[in-house]
Design a protein with these regions (language model features):
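Extracytoplasmic/secreted envelope proteins and their assembly/folding machinery
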Residues: 92, 123, 135-143, 158-162, ...
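Entry/capping segment at the start of metal-dependent catalytic domains
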Residues: 2-103, 275, 301
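Amphipathic, coiled-coil-like alpha-helical scaffolding segments used for oligomerization/assembly
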Residues: 132-196, 267-269
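C-terminal solvent-exposed extensions
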Residues: 60-62, 87, 118, 122, ...
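Flexible, polar/acidic helix-loop-strand segments at domain edges
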Residues: 166-252
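Second-shell loop/turn segments in exported
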Residues: 81-84, 124-132, 147-152, 204, ...
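Solvent-exposed, acidic/flexible segments
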Residues: 65-71, 77, 84-89, 119, ...
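Extracytoplasmic
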Residues: 67-70, 88-93, 102-110, 121, ...
Length: 345
């Protein structure tokens, strides 16, 4: 009898241990599933654009390395009415090229005033393409003029950028003498649009800029270098955002998602976004640069534009810098456009 009681007590203790283990497992699963469910819910709030891939045009060209990279077009629009789809010009055009194996990232700013051929519109500034035909025409224009294979995009306006930076606690930026008054002026404009207030920056040097201040910094163009240095500022801010995100705690990252994801417009679906987001801690921005590399700023048909000298040689350099390609030759389309642009100025 005593032996039976001892056995029952042992069984009860064993069941109790299993119950605790199950409770612990349930808690662990909840801790995993709740954040995952939150992420999926937030991603579902993104304004997804189901792009007609048949409308995306590419040239026939040979580049043995380009297939090892995921290339995404990043468009920044200065839309006061939160218009992200089209009918607005792109102030920022960046190709983010991600090495699928190493997760190294290269950022190429395509200067917005670059003189290119846009289908059905002729030669004009690159930033007009998005306004004329939305993402499809903008991406096709990029692909056709620069021998690229971009098929996806992310569009964001300046209000969303400001919110992202604030969610990360600001970004560290060094303010130079010729930038100071313009950063303050543009920051005031951003604050007015956002319905917020902003502190005036009074000293030169390193500052942790708020979202509004950093967005103002991204918009400055009236300094030495004009749009070239503005594009560089935009890449600097992106680098700082990635740096901050990589070191952020989970709560900050959830806050970032809460602020950012509902305010973007993209062709990427949920699985694409989750796949890209899973690599955030491994992404390493190895290089950033502006395109074209060798350029002139002539006036053509009354408009000041940026022309490559020559387009074909600059596109060759672009492929080398983005994809480390050594055996690429420009397509016949790029060669033709290169000769036509050269004859116009």
């Amino acid at each position: 009898m005593a032996g039976k009681k001892k056995k029952n007590t042992k069984e009860k203790k064993q069941k109790k241990k299993w119950r605790y283990a199950l409770y612990a497992l349930e808690i662990i699963l909840l801790l995993i599933l709740i954040p995952s469910a939150f992420c999926i819910y937030k991603i579902s709030q993104i304004e997804t654009y189901h792009m007609d891939q048949n409308k995306i045009e590419e040239n026939e060209f040979s580049d043995s390395n380009i297939g090892n990279y995921t290339n995404i077009a990043l468009f920044g629009v200065d839309s006061r009415a939160n218009e992200l789809t089209k009918n607005t010009r792109t102030d920022c055009i960046i190709i983010a090229s991600i090495n699928n194996k190493t997760k190294e990232v290269r950022l190429a700013s395509l200067y917005r005033d670059t003189y290119v051929y846009i289908a059905d519109h002729g030669y004009t500034k690159l930033n007009h393409a998005y306004a004329y035909g939305g993402p499809e025409l903008a991406i096709s224009t990029i692909n056709k003029n620069f021998d690229l294979n971009v098929h996806d995009f992310v569009t964001i306006n300046f209000s969303a950028l400001s919110n992202v930076i604030d969610a990360l606690g600001g970004v560290d930026i060094k303010i130079k003498k010729d930038e100071l008054k313009w950063v303050n002026a543009y920051a005031q404009d951003v604050a007015r649009i956002n319905g917020t207030k902003v502190k005036k920056i009074k000293k030169l040097g390193l500052h942790t800029l708020s979202g509004v201040q950093a967005t103002g910094y991204c918009r400055v163009r009236y300094t030495s270098g004009g749009d070239f240095t503005r594009a560089k500022r935009q890449r600097t801010v992106i680098q700082q955002i990635v740096k901050k995100a990589k070191s952020a705690d989970p709560i900050t990252l959830y806050q970032l998602m809460d602020e950012f994801l509902p305010q973007i417009y993209t062709s990427l679906d949920t699985s694409d976004i989750l796949s890209l987001a899973s690599g955030i801690f491994f992404y390493d921005i190895q290089a950033n640069f502006g395109f074209p590399f060798d350029s002139a700023t002539p006036t053509i048909n009354g408009a000041s534009v940026v022309t490559a000298e020559t387009l074909s040689s600059n596109v060759s350099k672009l492929h080398k810098k983005l994809f480390e390609t050594v055996n690429y030759s420009p397509s016949s389309t790029v060669e033709y456009r290169s000769n036509e642009i050269a004859s116009l100025h």
